[in-house]
Design a protein with these regions (language model features):
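C-terminal catalytic/substrate-binding lobe primarily of soluble NAD(P)-dependent oxidoreductases
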Residues: 145-434
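Hydrophobic/small residue at the entry helix of a nucleotide-binding pocket
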Residues: 12
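Conserved Rossmann-fold cofactor-binding substructure of NAD(P)-dependent oxidoreductases
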Residues: 58-69
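ADP-ribose/adenylate-binding Rossmann-like module
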Residues: 89-107
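Helix N-cap at the beta1-alpha1 junction of Rossmann-like dinucleotide-binding domains, i.e.
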Residues: 36-40, 104
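Rossmann-fold cofactor-recognition segment
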Residues: 47-60
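N-terminal Rossmann-like NAD(P) cofactor-binding module of classical short-chain dehydrogenase/reductase
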Residues: 72-76, 97-99
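Rossmann-fold NAD(P)-binding glycine/threonine-rich loop
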Residues: 101-123
């Protein structure tokens, strides 16, 4: 019997666990799953005979090493900052590893050691990154095999709320880490390539300079640029590609509303504001409106927004005009106060379903003519456990686990799923899930 060690069984692991257990008898697997929330973990394992629940500090190398040593494959669903430590343990113990997260510079530096240990460390095998890579590379390789020249590649993905559960004017609810949403785009300019030229898009313009796209049967979405698109030129073997843009999808008017919050300063996370025990959202908002006259907060905000004053209902809906609610935090950054409000306004309800939308656009030249291919994927969650995010992250990880254990994937070292021998069988099986 082959042992699979799963470190972390949180939000995105439900579908992964189900797949591993559903296939465990036929594949002769035993799943050892680890999470500090033992009750939640046992609920997900459902008393399956091929599953064993463990509750210990998976962040402690000395504690987890004995479990890694007994495993044939390790899957880390821990926060991304802990993957390198797990990878170092796997190299020392010569155990294969899968993570759904981006390859960090520290992880990439382990490539030679992983190859020397004869193991694969598979990263970026979730949805974004993951399915986006695989679905893109399939089409890129097809274009190249036709003797055509790729001119432009744009790729967008977004974790959103399903239309049936869309009940607010922002058309958004938290389906992922709220803090990551509030701080999205901060820290450095977005970099992409357009018509052969590098473009830098600073944070204060990120949600202004957006692109609208349409997905069949789901309408219009708006995309803002991700942090670094040009790193994927090498990843995809497209160093000479004139245009590459990767971005995140939202539903209008989200980007316009979020841009207004940025311009006000409400997403700032570099300084704190004291709460004397009476600090309300209305007071927070008034702090950032640059007018000293006696007009109401609403009137001053309308003046600040100018031609975008029609965004006022968005501010009202998330509670920024509220003069009764008192913030719980005693001291916080503007972004943290904003997050406290948004976690109330954008909380996923018990019957809400999430939605994952992915869109690719390829423009290529063949025989003197330009052609365009559009490719899209929409996944809608089943319920609060088997969400669209859980499905689209968990299934690729699970299928990759099977392929590694069955030695279908032979590649060693630190890698990602941009190679045919990896993406073809994974995409083929994913198609069975729609």
């Amino acid at each position: 019997m082959k042992n699979i060690l799963l470190l972390g069984a949180g939000l995105s692991a439900s579908t992964l666990i189900k797949y591993l257990l559903d296939h465990s008898i036929a594949e002769n697997w035993q799943l050892h799953a680890v999470d500090q929330d033992l009750q939640m973990l046992q609920s997900k394992l459902g008393g399956h005979p091929n599953a064993i629940a463990h509750s210990f500090n998976a962040l402690d190398s000395e504690v987890r090493k004995p479990y890694i040593e007994k495993a044939d494959l390790v899957i880390s669903m821990l926060p991304a900052i802990y993957h390198v430590g797990v990878a170092q343990d796997c190299i020392a113990l010569k155990k294969n590893l899968i993570t759904p997260s981006y390859i960090s510079d520290e992880m990439r530096a382990l490539d030679a050691n992983a190859k020397a240990a004869g193991i694969v460390i598979m990263n970026e095998i979730g949805v974004d990154p993951g399915i986006d890579h695989m679905s893109a590379m399939k089409i890129i390789h097809q274009i190249q095999e036709e003797g055509a020249t790729l001119l432009s590649f744009k790729s967008y993905c977004g974790g959103l709320i399903a239309p049936v559960s869309d009940t607010n004017q922002w058309h958004y609810k938290f389906t992922w880490n709220p803090r990551n949403v509030v701080l999205a785009g901060q820290g450095a300019a977005a970099i992409y390539k357009e018509a052969g030229a590098l473009k830098y898009l600073p944070y204060h313009r990120l949600f202004q300079q957006t692109e609208f796209i349409s997905v069949p049967n789901y309408g219009q979405f708006e995309a803002y640029a991700n942090r670094n698109s040009i790193s994927y030129l090498e990843t995809y073997g497209l160093q000479d590609l004139p245009t590459i843009i990767r971005g995140t999808l939202r539903v209008p008017p989200f980007c316009a509303g979020w841009n207004a919050l940025i311009q006000l300063g409400l997403t700032e996370d570099t300084y704190t504001i004291q709460n004397d025990g009476s600090f309300t959202p209305r007071m927070l908002l008034n702090t950032f409106i640059p007018f000293k006259d006696q007009r109401s907060v609403e009137q001053k905000l309308a003046a600040f927004l100018g031609e975008n004053a029609d965004l006022l209902p968005l501010f009202e809906e998330i509670g920024l005009f509220d003069a009764n609610y008192v913030f719980k935090a005693t001291v916080a950054t503007p972004a943290q106060y904003l997050q406290e409000l948004l976690e109330k306004a954008w909380k996923l309800g018990p019957t809400d379903n999430d939605m994952l939308v992915m869109y690719h656009e390829f423009i290529y030249e063949k025989a003197g003519k330009n052609f365009k291919i559009e490719s899209s994927m929409v996944a809608i969650g089943q319920d609060q456990r088997f969400t669209a995010m859980s499905d689209t992250v968990g299934l690729p990880v699970a299928i990759a686990a099977k392929l590694i254990l069955n030695q279908t994937i032979q590649r060693k070292g630190v890698t990602l799923p941009v190679y045919k021998e990896i993406y073809q069988p994974i995409l083929s099986e994913l198609e069975q899930y729609g």
